[in-house]
Protein backbone atom coordinates (compact mmCIF):
# COMPACT_ATOMS: atom_id res chain seq x y z
CA UNK A 1 0.00 0.00 0.00
CA UNK A 2 2.60 2.56 1.11
CA UNK A 3 4.94 1.62 -1.76
CA UNK A 4 2.18 2.14 -4.34
CA UNK A 5 1.29 5.46 -2.73
CA UNK A 6 4.94 6.55 -2.63
CA UNK A 7 5.32 5.81 -6.34
CA UNK A 8 2.22 7.86 -7.15
CA UNK A 9 3.78 10.73 -5.16
CA UNK A 10 6.91 10.26 -7.27
CA UNK A 11 4.81 10.40 -10.44
CA UNK A 12 3.25 13.73 -9.44
CA UNK A 13 6.69 15.29 -8.95
CA UNK A 14 7.99 13.68 -12.14
CA UNK A 15 5.18 15.24 -14.17
CA UNK A 16 5.47 18.57 -12.33
CA UNK A 17 9.10 19.08 -13.41
CA UNK A 18 8.89 17.45 -16.85
CA UNK A 19 9.56 20.67 -18.72
CA UNK A 20 11.62 22.54 -16.10
CA UNK A 21 14.93 20.89 -17.01
CA UNK A 22 14.36 21.46 -20.75
CA UNK A 23 12.62 24.83 -20.74
CA UNK A 24 14.45 26.25 -23.76
CA UNK A 25 13.90 23.10 -25.83
CA UNK A 26 10.21 23.02 -24.87
CA UNK A 27 9.73 26.67 -25.83
CA UNK A 28 11.20 25.97 -29.28
CA UNK A 29 9.10 22.84 -29.72
CA UNK A 30 5.79 24.49 -28.87
CA UNK A 31 6.59 27.90 -30.35
CA UNK A 32 6.00 29.80 -27.10
CA UNK A 33 8.08 31.93 -24.75
CA UNK A 34 10.12 30.48 -21.91
CA UNK A 35 7.79 32.40 -19.59
CA UNK A 36 4.85 30.41 -20.92
CA UNK A 37 6.76 27.16 -20.38
CA UNK A 38 7.40 28.23 -16.80
CA UNK A 39 3.66 28.10 -16.16
CA UNK A 40 3.72 24.37 -16.89
CA UNK A 41 5.49 24.04 -13.53
CA UNK A 42 4.12 27.10 -11.73
CA UNK A 43 0.54 25.88 -12.09
CA UNK A 44 1.33 23.25 -9.43
CA UNK A 45 2.02 25.53 -6.43
CA UNK A 46 -0.79 27.83 -7.59
CA UNK A 47 -3.40 25.06 -7.56
CA UNK A 48 -1.95 23.56 -4.37
CA UNK A 49 -2.61 26.84 -2.54
CA UNK A 50 -6.14 27.03 -3.98
CA UNK A 51 -7.12 23.38 -3.51
CA UNK A 52 -5.29 22.19 -0.38
CA UNK A 53 -8.22 22.84 1.98
CA UNK A 54 -10.90 21.26 -0.28
CA UNK A 55 -8.56 18.31 -0.89
CA UNK A 56 -8.21 17.71 2.84
CA UNK A 57 -11.98 17.81 3.30
CA UNK A 58 -12.46 15.28 0.48
CA UNK A 59 -9.91 12.93 2.04
CA UNK A 60 -11.55 13.13 5.46
CA UNK A 61 -15.03 12.39 4.08
CA UNK A 62 -14.30 9.91 1.29
CA UNK A 63 -10.71 8.84 1.81
CA UNK A 64 -10.33 5.82 -0.46
CA UNK A 65 -12.41 7.14 -3.41
CA UNK A 66 -10.72 10.54 -3.20
CA UNK A 67 -7.19 9.13 -3.11
CA UNK A 68 -7.93 6.61 -5.88
CA UNK A 69 -9.35 9.43 -8.01
CA UNK A 70 -6.25 11.52 -7.32
CA UNK A 71 -3.99 8.71 -8.49
CA UNK A 72 -6.12 8.18 -11.59
CA UNK A 73 -5.95 11.90 -12.42
CA UNK A 74 -2.16 11.80 -12.22
CA UNK A 75 -2.11 9.01 -14.81
CA UNK A 76 -4.73 10.76 -16.94
CA UNK A 77 -2.73 13.98 -16.99
CA UNK A 78 0.34 12.10 -18.17
CA UNK A 79 -1.59 10.69 -21.13
CA UNK A 80 -3.43 13.92 -21.96
CA UNK A 81 -0.05 15.52 -22.68
CA UNK A 82 0.26 13.04 -25.55
CA UNK A 83 -2.94 14.34 -27.17
CA UNK A 84 -1.09 16.65 -29.53
CA UNK A 85 2.22 18.41 -30.08
CA UNK A 86 0.94 21.77 -28.86
CA UNK A 87 1.33 23.88 -25.76
CA UNK A 88 -2.41 23.64 -25.09
CA UNK A 89 -2.25 19.85 -24.72
CA UNK A 90 0.79 20.15 -22.46
CA UNK A 91 -0.95 22.68 -20.22
CA UNK A 92 -4.15 20.60 -20.12
CA UNK A 93 -2.22 17.60 -18.86
CA UNK A 94 -0.31 19.66 -16.30
CA UNK A 95 -3.53 21.19 -14.94
CA UNK A 96 -5.06 17.73 -14.44
CA UNK A 97 -2.01 16.52 -12.51
CA UNK A 98 -1.85 19.78 -10.53
CA UNK A 99 -5.48 19.31 -9.46
CA UNK A 100 -4.62 15.81 -8.22
CA UNK A 101 -1.43 16.80 -6.40
CA UNK A 102 -2.96 18.27 -3.19
CA UNK A 103 -5.17 15.19 -2.82
CA UNK A 104 -2.25 12.81 -3.25
CA UNK A 105 0.31 14.64 -1.10
CA UNK A 106 -2.13 15.44 1.71
CA UNK A 107 -3.06 11.77 2.19
CA UNK A 108 0.20 10.47 3.66
CA UNK A 109 -0.57 10.70 7.39
CA UNK A 110 -4.15 9.45 7.06
CA UNK A 111 -3.04 6.56 4.83
CA UNK A 112 -0.46 5.47 7.40
CA UNK A 113 -3.02 5.85 10.18
CA UNK A 114 -5.58 3.62 8.47
CA UNK A 115 -3.34 0.92 7.03
CA UNK A 116 -0.31 0.56 9.32
CA UNK A 117 0.17 -0.45 12.98
CA UNK A 118 1.01 2.43 15.30
CA UNK A 119 4.66 1.43 15.61
CA UNK A 120 5.12 1.44 11.81
CA UNK A 121 3.36 4.70 10.97
CA UNK A 122 6.39 6.99 11.24
CA UNK A 123 8.32 4.72 8.89
CA UNK A 124 5.36 4.56 6.54
CA UNK A 125 5.09 8.34 6.42
CA UNK A 126 8.83 8.60 5.72
CA UNK A 127 8.58 6.05 2.88
CA UNK A 128 5.53 7.77 1.43
CA UNK A 129 7.15 11.19 1.57
CA UNK A 130 10.40 9.89 0.06
CA UNK A 131 8.54 9.39 -3.20
CA UNK A 132 8.55 13.14 -3.74
CA UNK A 133 12.36 13.24 -3.81
CA UNK A 134 12.49 10.19 -6.11
CA UNK A 135 10.13 11.89 -8.54
CA UNK A 136 12.11 15.13 -8.55
CA UNK A 137 15.35 13.26 -9.24
CA UNK A 138 13.75 11.24 -12.04
CA UNK A 139 12.40 14.39 -13.68
CA UNK A 140 15.77 16.11 -13.57
CA UNK A 141 17.56 13.05 -14.99
CA UNK A 142 15.03 12.00 -17.64
CA UNK A 143 14.36 15.50 -19.00
CA UNK A 144 17.80 16.20 -20.48
CA UNK A 145 18.56 12.54 -21.33
CA UNK A 146 15.28 11.59 -23.04
CA UNK A 147 13.65 14.90 -23.96
CA UNK A 148 16.48 16.98 -25.39
CA UNK A 149 17.36 17.38 -29.07
CA UNK A 150 13.79 17.22 -30.35
CA UNK A 151 12.82 14.04 -28.48
CA UNK A 152 10.14 15.54 -26.22
CA UNK A 153 7.50 13.05 -27.39
CA UNK A 154 9.68 10.13 -26.28
CA UNK A 155 10.02 11.67 -22.81
CA UNK A 156 6.26 12.19 -22.50
CA UNK A 157 5.53 8.57 -23.44
CA UNK A 158 7.98 7.20 -20.87
CA UNK A 159 6.61 9.46 -18.13
CA UNK A 160 3.01 8.55 -18.96
CA UNK A 161 3.85 4.87 -18.50
CA UNK A 162 5.69 5.63 -15.25
CA UNK A 163 2.56 7.41 -13.99
CA UNK A 164 -0.09 4.87 -14.97
CA UNK A 165 1.56 1.79 -13.41
CA UNK A 166 1.65 3.03 -9.77
CA UNK A 167 -1.73 4.75 -10.19
CA UNK A 168 -3.30 1.45 -11.24
CA UNK A 169 -1.61 -0.34 -8.35
CA UNK A 170 -2.90 2.24 -5.87
CA UNK A 171 -6.47 1.95 -7.16
CA UNK A 172 -6.29 -1.83 -6.74
CA UNK A 173 -4.88 -1.84 -3.20
CA UNK A 174 -7.35 0.84 -2.07
CA UNK A 175 -10.19 -1.59 -2.69
CA UNK A 176 -9.35 -3.04 0.73
CA UNK A 177 -10.70 -0.78 3.50
CA UNK A 178 -8.37 0.28 6.28
CA UNK A 179 -9.00 0.68 9.99
CA UNK A 180 -10.73 3.66 11.54
CA UNK A 181 -8.21 6.39 12.31
CA UNK A 182 -8.25 9.69 14.17
CA UNK A 183 -5.86 11.21 11.61
CA UNK A 184 -7.29 14.14 9.66
CA UNK A 185 -6.12 15.50 6.31
CA UNK A 186 -8.17 18.69 6.39
CA UNK A 187 -7.10 21.97 7.93
CA UNK A 188 -9.42 22.44 10.92
CA UNK A 189 -10.64 26.02 11.09
CA UNK A 190 -10.53 26.62 14.85
CA UNK A 191 -7.13 24.95 15.19
CA UNK A 192 -5.77 26.92 12.24
CA UNK A 193 -6.87 30.23 13.80
CA UNK A 194 -5.36 29.29 17.15
CA UNK A 195 -2.09 28.25 15.51
CA UNK A 196 -1.84 31.39 13.40
CA UNK A 197 -2.25 33.48 16.55
CA UNK A 198 1.06 32.06 17.82
CA UNK A 199 4.05 34.21 16.72
CA UNK A 200 6.36 31.14 16.43
CA UNK A 201 3.95 29.57 13.93
CA UNK A 202 3.96 32.68 11.75
CA UNK A 203 7.76 32.75 11.95
CA UNK A 204 8.02 29.13 10.80
CA UNK A 205 5.64 29.81 7.92
CA UNK A 206 7.73 32.81 6.87
CA UNK A 207 10.89 30.71 6.85
CA UNK A 208 9.35 27.93 4.77
CA UNK A 209 7.92 30.56 2.39
CA UNK A 210 11.46 31.82 1.76
CA UNK A 211 13.32 28.50 1.62
CA UNK A 212 10.82 26.43 -0.35
CA UNK A 213 10.19 29.42 -2.60
CA UNK A 214 13.86 29.58 -3.61
CA UNK A 215 13.99 25.81 -4.18
CA UNK A 216 10.92 25.85 -6.46
CA UNK A 217 12.25 28.87 -8.37
CA UNK A 218 15.60 27.15 -8.96
CA UNK A 219 13.94 23.89 -10.01
CA UNK A 220 11.73 25.80 -12.45
CA UNK A 221 14.18 28.32 -13.93
CA UNK A 222 17.80 27.24 -13.42
CA UNK A 223 18.22 25.82 -16.92
CA UNK A 224 16.87 28.98 -18.55
CA UNK A 225 18.92 31.30 -16.34
CA UNK A 226 22.19 29.47 -17.04
CA UNK A 227 21.66 28.98 -20.79
CA UNK A 228 23.07 32.45 -21.73
CA UNK A 229 26.29 31.48 -19.91
CA UNK A 230 26.69 28.46 -22.19
CA UNK A 231 25.53 25.88 -19.64
CA UNK A 232 23.79 23.03 -21.46
CA UNK A 233 20.44 21.52 -20.47
CA UNK A 234 22.26 18.36 -19.39
CA UNK A 235 24.70 20.30 -17.21
CA UNK A 236 21.92 22.39 -15.65
CA UNK A 237 19.97 19.22 -14.94
CA UNK A 238 23.08 17.73 -13.37
CA UNK A 239 23.40 20.74 -11.06
CA UNK A 240 19.82 20.28 -9.87
CA UNK A 241 20.34 16.54 -9.42
CA UNK A 242 23.38 17.30 -7.26
CA UNK A 243 21.33 19.74 -5.22
CA UNK A 244 18.51 17.26 -4.59
CA UNK A 245 20.85 14.33 -3.88
CA UNK A 246 22.86 16.37 -1.37
CA UNK A 247 19.65 17.64 0.20
CA UNK A 248 18.17 14.14 0.43
CA UNK A 249 21.23 12.85 2.28
CA UNK A 250 21.18 15.91 4.54
CA UNK A 251 17.48 15.31 5.30
CA UNK A 252 18.40 11.94 6.77
CA UNK A 253 21.22 13.35 8.91
CA UNK A 254 20.64 16.96 9.93
CA UNK A 255 17.05 17.20 11.31
CA UNK A 256 17.66 14.77 14.22
CA UNK A 257 20.92 16.55 15.10
CA UNK A 258 19.28 19.97 15.01
CA UNK A 259 16.34 18.78 17.13
CA UNK A 260 18.58 17.06 19.68
CA UNK A 261 20.70 20.18 20.16
CA UNK A 262 17.78 22.64 19.92
CA UNK A 263 19.80 24.41 17.24
CA UNK A 264 16.92 25.52 15.01
CA UNK A 265 17.78 29.22 15.17
CA UNK A 266 21.45 28.71 14.29
CA UNK A 267 20.62 26.28 11.50
CA UNK A 268 18.03 28.60 9.95
CA UNK A 269 20.38 31.55 10.14
CA UNK A 270 23.04 29.50 8.36
CA UNK A 271 20.53 28.29 5.76
CA UNK A 272 19.50 31.87 5.01
CA UNK A 273 23.11 32.99 4.50
CA UNK A 274 24.07 29.95 2.41
CA UNK A 275 20.96 30.49 0.28
CA UNK A 276 21.87 34.13 -0.29
CA UNK A 277 25.54 33.58 -1.11
CA UNK A 278 24.68 30.52 -3.21
CA UNK A 279 22.32 32.55 -5.40
CA UNK A 280 24.96 35.27 -5.81
CA UNK A 281 27.56 32.65 -6.79
CA UNK A 282 25.20 31.12 -9.36
CA UNK A 283 24.80 34.53 -10.95
CA UNK A 284 28.41 35.72 -10.83
CA UNK A 285 30.70 32.67 -10.93
CA UNK A 286 32.27 32.10 -14.37
CA UNK A 287 33.10 28.44 -13.69
CA UNK A 288 30.67 25.53 -13.65
CA UNK A 289 32.53 23.91 -10.75
CA UNK A 290 31.90 26.91 -8.51
CA UNK A 291 28.24 26.88 -9.46
CA UNK A 292 28.10 23.16 -8.63
CA UNK A 293 29.59 23.74 -5.18
CA UNK A 294 27.18 26.60 -4.55
CA UNK A 295 24.04 24.70 -5.49
CA UNK A 296 25.08 21.55 -3.59
CA UNK A 297 25.66 23.68 -0.49
CA UNK A 298 22.21 25.19 -0.97
CA UNK A 299 20.69 21.72 -1.23
CA UNK A 300 22.36 20.65 2.02
CA UNK A 301 20.59 23.41 3.96
CA UNK A 302 17.41 24.26 2.02
CA UNK A 303 15.93 20.76 1.78
CA UNK A 304 16.48 19.72 5.44
CA UNK A 305 15.00 23.06 6.52
CA UNK A 306 11.55 21.78 5.50
CA UNK A 307 11.42 18.71 7.80
CA UNK A 308 13.02 20.76 10.59
CA UNK A 309 10.27 23.37 10.26
CA UNK A 310 7.56 20.70 9.99
CA UNK A 311 8.81 19.01 13.15
CA UNK A 312 8.94 22.30 15.04
CA UNK A 313 5.43 23.24 13.88
CA UNK A 314 3.99 19.89 14.93
CA UNK A 315 5.65 20.12 18.36
CA UNK A 316 4.21 23.60 18.77
CA UNK A 317 0.72 22.44 17.74
CA UNK A 318 0.36 19.41 19.98
CA UNK A 319 -2.76 17.47 19.00
CA UNK A 320 -3.34 19.85 16.06
CA UNK A 321 -0.14 18.62 14.39
CA UNK A 322 -1.92 17.64 11.18
CA UNK A 323 -3.32 21.13 10.74
CA UNK A 324 0.08 22.66 11.52
CA UNK A 325 1.77 20.53 8.87
CA UNK A 326 -0.86 21.47 6.29
CA UNK A 327 -0.39 25.18 7.04
CA UNK A 328 3.38 24.85 6.62
CA UNK A 329 2.92 23.12 3.26
CA UNK A 330 0.54 25.86 2.16
CA UNK A 331 3.09 28.53 3.09
CA UNK A 332 5.83 26.66 1.22
CA UNK A 333 3.80 26.33 -1.95
CA UNK A 334 2.75 29.97 -1.78
CA UNK A 335 6.42 30.88 -1.51
CA UNK A 336 7.20 28.63 -4.47
CA UNK A 337 4.60 30.42 -6.57
CA UNK A 338 5.62 33.96 -5.57
CA UNK A 339 9.39 33.51 -5.91
CA UNK A 340 9.07 31.58 -9.18
CA UNK A 341 6.90 34.37 -10.62
CA UNK A 342 9.44 36.95 -9.46
CA UNK A 343 12.19 35.06 -11.29
CA UNK A 344 9.96 34.70 -14.36
CA UNK A 345 9.72 38.49 -14.59
CA UNK A 346 13.53 38.67 -14.60
CA UNK A 347 14.19 35.50 -16.60
CA UNK A 348 15.89 37.37 -19.47
CA UNK A 349 18.22 39.08 -16.98
CA UNK A 350 19.87 36.11 -15.22
CA UNK A 351 22.11 38.08 -12.85
CA UNK A 352 19.18 40.20 -11.67
CA UNK A 353 17.11 37.04 -11.17
CA UNK A 354 19.79 35.36 -9.05
CA UNK A 355 20.35 38.53 -7.02
CA UNK A 356 16.59 38.80 -6.46
CA UNK A 357 16.55 35.25 -5.07
CA UNK A 358 19.48 36.16 -2.84
CA UNK A 359 17.54 39.16 -1.55
CA UNK A 360 14.51 36.95 -0.87
CA UNK A 361 16.75 34.62 1.12
CA UNK A 362 17.94 37.51 3.29
CA UNK A 363 14.32 38.15 4.28
CA UNK A 364 14.71 35.04 6.40
CA UNK A 365 17.39 36.60 8.66
CA UNK A 366 15.02 38.53 10.95
CA UNK A 367 12.70 35.52 10.98
CA UNK A 368 15.51 33.19 12.04
CA UNK A 369 16.47 35.65 14.78
CA UNK A 370 12.97 35.33 16.25
CA UNK A 371 13.25 31.59 16.75
CA UNK A 372 13.76 30.30 20.26
CA UNK A 373 15.06 26.93 21.42
CA UNK A 374 12.98 24.95 21.99
CA UNK A 375 10.48 26.34 19.47
CA UNK A 376 7.57 28.13 21.11
CA UNK A 377 9.41 29.14 24.28
CA UNK A 378 9.46 32.92 24.61
CA UNK A 379 12.67 34.64 25.55
CA UNK A 380 11.17 35.17 28.97
CA UNK A 381 11.19 31.39 29.48
CA UNK A 382 7.47 30.45 29.65
CA UNK A 383 6.55 27.94 26.94
CA UNK A 384 3.77 28.83 24.55
CA UNK A 385 0.81 26.49 25.00
CA UNK A 386 0.29 23.74 22.48
CA UNK A 387 -2.90 23.97 20.48
CA UNK A 388 -5.54 21.43 21.38
CA UNK A 389 -8.29 20.41 19.02
What are the language-model segments listed below?
Residues 19-20, 200-241, 248:
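Extracytoplasmic gate region of multi-pass secondary transporters
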Residues 50-85:
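Conserved MFS/SLC helix-loop-helix module at the cytosolic interface between two early adjacent transmembrane helices
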Residues 51-63, 250-263:
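Helix-to-loop junctions at the C-terminal end of transmembrane segments
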Residues 93-131:
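Cytoplasmic helix-loop-helix junction between adjacent transmembrane helices
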Residues 127-175:
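Helix-loop-helix hairpin linking two adjacent transmembrane segments in secondary transporters
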Residues 175-204:
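Juxtamembrane intracellular "pre-TM" segments in multi-pass secondary transporters
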Residues 264-309:
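C-terminal transmembrane helical hairpin of 12-TM major facilitator-type secondary transporters
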Residues 316-349, 357:
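A late C-terminal transmembrane helix in Major Facilitator Superfamily
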